[in-house]
């Protein structure tokens, strides 16, 4: 009896607790409803309590959406079905309507950023599913802001290996039915990439099999130990999917095969395999031929599609995600084209300054150079004489571009005479480079030094020169870090952890471009291959973009110093946004700020045109890679200063400035002029990198935008070769950079358009805030220990990588700027 009573009492107690919990939940919901009604009313105040309630409601809506997706088992789907995409779109649509009702009057500058960034993120996600991007098997696993078609550029194959292969395969089969198939040129590059990355063991077996001179890609995949469904997916892609293309056919091979001889006369992207002894062996069949390089209409926008979906609508969705704007493909193309043409004139001013340094004020500049017209291609280096400035003072930009691409301006391509045993041993035994020697070993570059490989040709140099050129590039980027990092930190209110430097795996280097920043390991990555790396005069702008103050600073800031709302930081959104237009826009913004901060010389803050990229007024001293040189007169030049400029970047500036004036017994004068040339050319690198991003807007859309009208020198549906020709004529980029970048824009659909989109917004905000504060440009940078620029940078950084509209609203609210209505 007592036992039964005890059991009954326990049940009553339990029921009572549940009723109390339900009553509390009801009371809370009534309170939340009252707060919500107040938030949505136009009469609500902007009190701290109201601000907290609004911030909480934004976060609750975000949580509610995520919970609804999770409960429907739709929260972590990287290969959705048609039905799943439809349901996901409906859920996003419902919550977009809810968050839109929150009244901005209750929001702080931070919660305003949260509201509009979340809303935009949901709109982008809905657009991905409404436009059936699932048929491209894109990178859903990277989040709404980074959904790009399966491609040859980003190293995603390990990630794909963890996905549901059956659904990936089903999506591609459905894509074939809808005629949403990437071009043969595009798809062959994808096959090339995954064969080179996933099947090295099988390639070695093929190399060693003397009875075979060819093998089909399907048979190569079949011979591997990959899991069965993964195997079937890759085989389908390399056979049925590849052959279903109706545009951009190029060589139009019916069965993709690998050959031991170059039967298809391919020009580039031959696969590097190895025999059992480690010797590099070229395999052919998956590289690019002349037909591939000249093929028009190879981009996504030209995928035929049907009544329900087409490549053009898919590209426009990706473009909206990348630029965080509603600009059409034709509008983006025109912006890129016009800014490219306008900026090309800047090089003339730099060429004149360089001419004055090297040959004298106003004199004719004729230079002998060693020039490799096709980079990694079969053509040999040629000695040429170029007239950069004639007797009348006219500058010839193509000749100046050739001079800037002289072999000596590339690490590893200085010529065999440079690579003495003393130089090589000095690099190998330098204690500051010990860890980088280890990096080269770890990523499989030691094979370049083996007896059978070291004297073999790599382009126009040897494999050994390739290796030591890579090691000397490590030295240069380490020197950049040591000379600029502490100065760069002065412009930020919060300090971030240090970064390190790394390269890529040997068998990935042809696909990865010149470099990137890896936030997971806090490392600035660069390509050590002398034919896929940037010239020496781009070291500052490139390294600043990727490291301190660029990507590294922004991404580490997002991990440590994000905003909050309420007392004691009660409400925090966290690091949830990763929009490329912001991430790359910030890095480009910092490239520009290097000019404003004096990395290249004394900034021209007072130029009459208001040109933010204006040439520094004096290149004698700088805060960048030559900040070891503080001398204003020859008497102040020390032996250590002379030695450092002699060694900088393998002596290229010391050598180039002495083309005419040999500086006999004038080492101090020689050093001063070499430093000026180094700073001048690093500034040229900054302008050239800015020009590269101008071109990216035009080139990505020229490849993929079916709605683009085009231009005489850059037509719509441009071929790879047409893109390269445009880059040659409108920049100082090296042939290796042009080669890798032109492949990248075709492969990484839409991504290249993100860079300038974000930078333009940030530079516009910079100028508006400076003027709103009533400060000159110099005061904005320098006054009160950089106080004002620190506060502005914090306003940009404190809410992670926002869509541009949200960033504009947030910064404008903080500084009282007027937001222009769309």
Q: Across the structure, where does each feature detected by a protein language model lie?
A:
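N-terminal maturation segment of proteins
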Residues: 3-822
């Amino acid at each position: 009896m007592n036992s039964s009573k005890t059991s009954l009492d326990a049940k009553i107690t339990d029921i009572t607790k549940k009723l109390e919990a339900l009553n509390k939940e009801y009371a809370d919901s009534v309170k939340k409803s009252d707060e919500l009604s107040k938030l949505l009313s136009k009469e609500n105040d902007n009190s701290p309590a109201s601000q907290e309630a609004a911030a909480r409601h934004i976060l609750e809506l975000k949580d509610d959406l995520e919970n609804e997706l999770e409960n429907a088992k739709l929260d972590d789907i990287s290969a959705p079905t048609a039905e799943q995409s439809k349901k996901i779109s409906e859920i996003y649509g419902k919550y977009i309507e809810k968050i839109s009702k929150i009244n901005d009057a209750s929001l702080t500058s931070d919660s305003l950023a949260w509201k509009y960034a979340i809303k935009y993120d949901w709109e982008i996600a809905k657009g991905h599913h409404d436009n059936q991007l699932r048929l491209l098997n894109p990178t859903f696993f990277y989040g709404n802001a980074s959904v790009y078609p399966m491609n040859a550029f980003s190293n995603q194959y390990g990630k794909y290996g963890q996905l549901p292969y059956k659904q990936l395969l089903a999506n591609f089969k459905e894509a074939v039915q809808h005629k949403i198939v990437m071009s043969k040129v595009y798809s062959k590059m994808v096959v090339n990439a995954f064969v080179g990355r996933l099947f090295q063991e099988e390639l070695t077996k093929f190399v060693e099999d003397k009875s075979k001179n060819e093998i089909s890609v399907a048979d190569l995949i079949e011979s591997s130990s990959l899991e069965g469904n993964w195997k079937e997916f890759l085989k389908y892609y390399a056979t049925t999917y590849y052959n279903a293309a109706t545009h951009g056919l190029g060589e139009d091979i019916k069965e993709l095969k690998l050959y031991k001889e170059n039967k298809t006369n391919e020009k580039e992207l031959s696969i590097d395999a190895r025999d059992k002894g480690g010797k590099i062996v070229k395999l052919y069949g998956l590289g690019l031929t002349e037909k591939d390089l000249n093929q028009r209409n190879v981009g996504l926008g030209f995928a035929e599609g049907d009544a329900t979906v087409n490549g053009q609508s898919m590209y426009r969705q990706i473009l909206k995600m990348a630029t965080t704007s509603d600009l059409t493909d034709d509008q983006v193309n025109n912006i890129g084209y016009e800014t490219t043409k306008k900026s090309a004139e800047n090089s003339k001013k730099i060429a004149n300054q360089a001419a004055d340094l090297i040959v004298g004020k106003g004199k004719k500049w004729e230079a002998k150079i060693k020039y490799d017209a096709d980079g990694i291609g079969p053509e040999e280096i040629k000695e040429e004489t170029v007239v950069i400035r004639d007797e009348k003072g006219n500058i010839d930009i193509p000749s100046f571009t050739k001079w800037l691409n002289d072999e000596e301006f590339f690490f590893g391509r200085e010529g065999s005479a440079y690579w003495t045993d003393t130089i090589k041993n000095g690099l190998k035994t330098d204690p500051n480079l010990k860890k980088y020697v280890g990096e080269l070993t770890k990523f499989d570059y030691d094979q370049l030094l083996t007896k059978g490989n070291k004297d073999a040709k790599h382009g126009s140099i040897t494999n050994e020169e390739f290796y030591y050129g890579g090691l000397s590039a490590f030295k240069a980027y380490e020197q950049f870090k040591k000379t600029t990092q502490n100065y760069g930190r002065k412009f930020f209110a919060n300090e971030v952890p240090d970064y390190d430097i790394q390269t890529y795996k040997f068998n990935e280097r042809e696909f990865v471009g010149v470099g990137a920043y890896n936030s997971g390991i806090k490392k600035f990555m660069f390509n050590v291959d002398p034919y896929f790396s940037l010239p020496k005069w781009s070291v500052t702008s490139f390294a600043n973009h990727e490291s301190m103050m660029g990507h590294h600073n922004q991404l580490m800031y997002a991990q440590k110093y994000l905003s909050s709302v309420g007392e004691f930081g009660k409400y925090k959104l966290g690091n949830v946004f990763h929009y490329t237009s912001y991430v790359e826009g910030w890095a480009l913004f910092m490239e520009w700020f290097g000019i404003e901060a004096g990395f290249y010389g004394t900034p021209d803050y007072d130029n009459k045109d208001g040109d933010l990229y204006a040439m520094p007024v004096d290149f004698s001293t700088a805060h960048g890679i030559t900040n070891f040189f503080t001398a204003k007169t020859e008497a102040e030049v020390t032996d250590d200063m002379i030695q450092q400029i002699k060694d900088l970047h393998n002596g290229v500036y010391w050598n180039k400035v002495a083309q005419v004036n040999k500086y006999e017994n004038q080492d101090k004068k020689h050093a001063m002029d070499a430093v000026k040339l180094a700073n001048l050319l690093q500034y040229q690198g900054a302008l050239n990198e800015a020009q590269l991003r101008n071109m990216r807007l035009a080139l990505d859309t020229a490849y993929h935008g079916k709605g683009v009208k085009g231009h005489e020198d850059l037509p719509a549906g441009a071929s790879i070769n047409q893109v390269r020709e445009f880059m040659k004529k409108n920049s100082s980029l090296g042939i290796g950079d042009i080669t890798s970048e032109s492949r990248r824009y075709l492969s990484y659909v839409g991504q290249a358009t993100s860079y300038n989109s974000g930078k333009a917004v940030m530079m516009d905000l910079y100028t508006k805030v400076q003027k709103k504060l009533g400060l000159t440009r110099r005061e904005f940078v320098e006054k009160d220990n950089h106080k004002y620029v620190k506060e502005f940078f914090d306003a940009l950084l404190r809410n992670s990588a926002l869509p541009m509209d949200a960033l504009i609203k947030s910064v404008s609210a903080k500084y009282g700027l007027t937001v222009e209505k769309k």
